[in-house]
UniProtKB/Swiss-Prot annotation:
GO biological process: cell division; chromatin remodeling; DNA recombination; DNA repair; positive regulation of DNA repair; positive regulation of DNA-templated transcription; positive regulation of telomere maintenance in response to DNA damage; regulation of cell cycle
Species the sequence originates in: Mus musculus
Residues annotated for ATP binding in this entry: 55-56, 283-286
Protein name listed in UniProt: Actin-related protein 8
Skewed-composition ranges (Basic and acidic residues): 1-25
Quaternary data: Component of the chromatin remodeling INO80 complex; specifically part of a complex module associated with the DBINO domain of INO80. Exists as monomers and dimers, but the dimer is most probably the biologically relevant form required for stable interactions with histones that exploits the twofold symmetry of the nucleosome core.
Keyword Cytoplasm: no
Encoding gene, per UniProt annotation: Actr8
Amino acid sequence: MTQAEKGDAENGKEKGGEKEKEQRGVKRPIVPALVPESLQEQIQSNFIVVIHPGSTTLRLGRATDTLPVSVPHVIARRHKQQGQPLYKDNWLLREGLNKPESNEQRQNGLKMVDQAIWSKKMSNGTRRIPVSPEQTRSYNKQMRPAILDHCSGNKWTNTSQQPEYLVGEEALYVNPLDCYNIHWPIRRGQLNIHPGPGGSLTAVLADIEVIWSHAIQKYLEIPLKDLKYYRCILLIPDIYNKQHVKELVHMILMKMGFAGIVVHQESVCATFGSGLSSTCVVDVGDQKTSVCCVEDGVSHRNTRLCLAYGGSDVSRCFYWLMQRAGFPYRECQLTNKMDCLLLQHLKETFCHLDQDISGLQDHEFQIRHPDSPALLYQFRLGDEKLQAPMALFYPATFGIVGQKMTTLQHRSQGDPEDPHDEHYLLATQSKQEQSAKATADRKSASKPIGFEGDLRGQSSDLPERLHSQEVDLASSQGDCLMAGNESEEALTALMSRKTAISLFEGKALGLDKAILHSVDCCSSDDTKKKMYSSILVVGGGLMFHKAQEFLQHRILNKMPPSFRRIIENVDVITRPKDMDPRLIAWKGGAVLACLDTTQELWIYQREWQRFGVRMLRERAAFVW
C-alpha cells in the first residue's frame, strides 16, 4: 500500500469514528461549526447573555459588552375585553402608608433625623442652623410656573395598531386613558405575586418571558430562534425563593430556549465586578436593600438580611418633605407614572448627604409631560434635601406600618422534586442527633434576647440564634414524641425563637445598623475585621453626594469598641474602578462568564429536562 493510500485509509477511519461518536450521542459544541481555534474563547463569551433583573430596571447584555442595556422592567398588556377595569401596579406607593399610626411614625422619624443632623458638626467645627419648613412655605406657595413651550416634546406611546403588549419605555409612556394594564413583575427583589389581575405565578413568569425576549431581540439583536446557540448567566438575590428560581431557570432553558445557564448571587457577582475578594456588600436598590458578607466568592448565609426599603421610598419621603415646604407643583400625584419619574429625577438632582450644605437655596425644575406644555417651576428648599436620604438610616421616617421590614435567611419550604433538601435531611437524622439538637435549642433559647435599642449593645450569641433558621415545626413535634418532658421545653424554646425572629423582622433597621448586624453574624473575629475594613456599596439607591463619607462616619461611630481599636481604616467603596455602582453586579456576571471554573457550573437544557431542580443542588456555586 502506498503512502497516499495509507493516508486516505486513516482519514476514512477518522471520519468513521466521528460518525460513530455522533451515533453514540456525544454532545455537539454549542458554538457554531467552522470557528478557528484562536477565536473559540472570544466566541464563547460572545455567546453568553448576562441577565440582572431588578425591581425597576432590567440590565442585560453579552458577556463581551462593556456596559449592559438598561430597560425599565415593566410591561403594559392590552385589555382582552372592552369595559375591563384598568389595573396598574404601584411604583412609589406601597402597603402600610395610610395607617392611623403612619403620620405619627413619620414625625418621630423626622425628629430623630433632625437630632442626628444637629449633633454632627460641620467641617468648620460649628453646628448647622436648622431651617424650618415655614421659612420656605410662604415663598414657594407664591410661585407660579412659567411656560417654556406650548409643546413639551414628549408624546404618549402610539397604540393605534393595538399591540398586545408594550415593554420598557413604551410601557411607561402608555396614555392612562388607553386600555392597558401596567405590571411590574418584580417587587422588592422577588416575583410580584399578588391577588390582583396578572398576579399569579404563571402570569408573572409570562410577563418576564415577554420583557426579556423583547429586550434580547431589540437591544442585543439576537433572534429568539438562535438562543439555542447561547448560554445565560442569571443573577438572583442573596435571599432567594427556591421555587421562584426554579421556575425562572425552567423558563430560560425550556421556554426561551437557551442552551445552558449558570445561576449566581448578586452579592458575589458584585465582588467579581469590583475586583474585591472579601467585603461586606451593601446593595441599595430602588425597592429593597440587601446586606451580606462575602469572602472568597462565598456569601455567608447567616450574614444575609434584606430590608424592605430603597430608593423609591426616599423619593416618596422627599415628596412628603417638599409638600411640607409648599412644593409649587400642586398637581403632583404618586399614582401618576410621569410624576413618579419626575420625583425620582428631583431626588437624584437635589438630594445629598453633605452636612456642609446648609441654609435656604433656590432651585428650578422643568415638567415635560406628554401632550402638555413645558413648564418651568422655581422653588426654595432647606434641610429637606439632606433629611430625605437620611431616612435610609432612620426608616421610621418612611411611615410604613404593619409590614415585614427585615428578612433573614430562612429554611426553605421544601420541594418534592428535590430529594435531598433540608426537610429530607431532618427526617433522616438519627434519634441521638435530634435529641442533641433539641437540647442545644433549649439552651440557646433560655438566654434573653434584646431586640430593642442599639444593636451594638447586644450579646454576640444573637446572630447565632437568628442564623440557625426556623427549625421545622413538624420535626420538633416528632421530638416531642421521642424525648418526653424534655421535648416540651424544646418546643417552648422553638416558639420563643420564632417569636424573637418575628419581632426582629417586624422592625425596620437603619442601613448602618443592618451593616453592623451582618458583620456581627460572621463566625470569627478575623472575618469581622476584614468586613469592617471593606464595605462595598452597589445599586442606585445611595448615589448621593458625600454618601461615602457619611456612611463611613456612622459605621466608625457605632462599631464595637474592641474593633475600633484594632481596625486602622473603614474603607467604604461607592464607585469601584470609577464604575457606575448600578452596573457592578452585572459586570461581575460578565467576569464570571469568562472564568475557567465556570465551565463546571453550566446546567444544560437536556440535563434540566431529565433531572430538574437537582441540577441546581449539584451545580450551583452556592449552597442550594
